[in-house]
Design a protein with these regions (language model features):
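Acidic, glycine-rich flexible loop/linker segments
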Residues: 1-29, 34-149
Length: 149
């Protein structure tokens, strides 16, 4: 289930310590867990995306990922997660192991078994004009998620 929009690529990390290890070598990580807990917050902030087997739109992983602006897929119930073996078996039989490069799309829930070249979103001139008008004519200001801008 898509839970936080955007896409992220990196090496699969199935523990908080593995994300931290990858980060120390400037390697992008995708955190995969059965579910996240508050102890995972550091790894979540360092990862380029998250995938959990359990959870829904109001689960810990989904709420934290949206707040941090990190792509996230939750409730991937059609997969088999073998935590001890550090593998994730997809419904089509493909196996993702810790260290594999993958890409996740938090907008659609898609998992790609390779590192997909990503590009940052483009700001159109129409959107820029709309923001300019809003700035000129607004009587109030709205501030939200300043840490993700």
């Amino acid at each position: 289930m898509p839970a936080s929009p955007g896409a992220g690529s990196g090496r699969v990390a199935m523990s908080t310590n593995k994300v931290i290890e990858y980060n120390s070598t400037e390697t992008d990580a995708i955190l995969i867990k059965s579910e996240t807990i508050s102890d995972d917050i550091n790894a979540m902030s360092l990862s380029k995306g998250e995938l959990t087997v359990k959870g829904g739109m109001t689960s810990h992983a989904a709420v934290i990922a949206r707040g941090m602006g990190i792509p996230c897929i939750v409730g991937a119930r059609n997969v088999v997660f073998k935590e001890k073996e550090k593998i994730l078996i997809l419904d089509d039989g493909n196996v993702i192991s810790e260290g594999d490069e993958i890409t996740i799309d938090g907008s659609t829930g898609a998992i790609y078994l390779e590192k997909v070249k990503l590009r940052p979103p483009e700001t159109t001139t129409t959107f820029s004009t709309l923001l300019q008008w809003a700035g000129e004519f607004c009587d109030i200001q709205i501030r939200a998620n300043a840490d993700t801008v």
